[in-house]
UniProtKB/Swiss-Prot annotation:
Gene: CSTLP1
Record organism: Oryza sativa subsp. japonica
GO CC term (a single one): Golgi membrane
UniProt keyword Transmembrane helix present: yes
Topological domain ranges for the Lumenal compartment: 24-33, 97-100, 145-157, 220-233, 284-286
Protein name: CMP-sialic acid transporter 1
Gene Ontology MF annotations: pyrimidine nucleotide-sugar transmembrane transporter activity; sialic acid transmembrane transporter activity
Short name of any one Pfam family annotated for the protein: Nuc_sug_transp
Function: Sugar transporter involved in the transport of CMP-sialic acid from the cytoplasm into the Golgi. May transport important nucleotide sugars such as CMP-Kdo (2-keto-3-deoxy-D-manno-octulosonic acid) in physiological conditions.
Length: 322
């Protein structure tokens, strides 16, 4: 399977996440416990990967699997990073408004490029660096409100701690992605075996988070397993399937492509979500959205198009004698 097909599918699925989540609400509220969604998504990814790993083991050429604990324990790290990241997200939102947080989140585009260079020793050309920065500028432009919609200085009115936590959140998100790519490419183990290790820890950590939530609430709603499917509808299950499928596609890209492709996919998905929201939820289209889309398309061409196509001048037409 070509990486650009996986990237395109990831863009479509990621763009539909927010839309499906909104459609799963009833009168603006969730009838289900939304903390169960990540747990079931991790369980779906683990079940899917386990099945195909079993199929590989039944074949005439068994897959390569590194089973030493010193290798397996490395797959614990992404779950720890994401757990810290989720808590930093909540802490950040106590200091800044959601729009400011979303704009600061675009820092992860640039920090991914930096960690891509420092951790994975992958060098980007000057043109590619410019493209990555343009992508961050484009996504930020699409999210900035006009002065008529909100105070123009609202972006810079949050406490200093909010900006520091926002930067930390972006760095943690980039670190989790780059570290996962490092795990996927450090050996030639089967992708499904690597997924099984990754998602086993994901299931354990999400289960632990549900148990922690029960203790924090004093078990007033009962244990989490008794309300696991309460309020679930077809749309809710579509959210679970969507979240699980995007995770599987991301792990494929981490194994056979790289983090920058994933960053472009998710950034384009965000813009696609905005465009679809204009038609589905009567959200007003803005000049900033249009400009952001144009900038991101230019960035996409700059990063992936062969250099000779970007700089090649058209051939002069031959002079014909009369």
């Amino acid at each position: 399977m070509q990486w650009y097909l996986v990237a395109a599918l990831l863009t479509v699925l990621t763009s539909s996440q927010g839309i499906l989540t909104t459609l799963s609400q009833s009168n603006g509220k969730y009838k289900y416990d939304y903390a169960t969604i990540p747990f079931l998504a991790e369980l779906f990814k683990l079940s899917f990967s386990s099945f195909f790993l079993w199929k590989e083991c039944q074949s005439s050429s068994p897959p390569r699997m590194t089973k030493e604990w010193r290798s397996i324990r490395l797959y614990l790290v992404p779950s720890v990073i994401y757990l810290i990241h989720n808590n930093v997200q909540f802490a950040t939102l106590t200091y800044v408004d959601p729009s400011t947080y979303q704009i600061m989140g675009n820092l992860k585009i640039v920090t991914t490029g930096i960690l891509f260079r420092l951790v994975l020793k992958r060098k980007l050309s000057n043109l590619q660096w410019m493209a990555v920065v343009l992508l961050a500028v484009g996504t930020t432009t699409s999210q900035v409100k006009g002065c008529g919609d909100a105070p123009c200085d609202s972006l810079f009115s949050a406490p200093f701690q909010g900006y520091m936590l926002g930067i930390l959140s972006a760095c943690l998100s980039a670190l989790a992605g780059v570290y996962t790519e490092y795990l996927m490419k450090k050996n030639n183990d089967s992708l499904y075996w690597q997924n099984v290790q990754l998602y086993t820890f994901g299931v354990i950590f999400n289960m632990g988070w549900l148990i922690y939530g029960d203790f924090k609430a004093g078990f007033e709603r009962g244990p989490w397993w008794q309300r696991l499917f309460n309020g679930y509808s077809i749309t809710t299950w579509m959210v679970v399937f969507n979240l699980g499928s995007t995770g599987l596609l991301v792990s494929w890209l981490m194994k056979y492509s790289d983090n920058i492709v994933k960053v472009y996919s998710t950034s384009m998905a965000m813009l696609l979500t905005m465009v679809l929201s204009v038609y589905l939820f009567n959200v007003r289209a803005t000049l900033q959205l249009f400009l952001g889309i144009v900038i991101c398309i230019i960035s996409l061409q700059m990063y992936f198009m062969p250099v000779n196509m970007l700089v090649e001048l058209p051939q002069a037409l031959p002079v014909t004698s009369k």
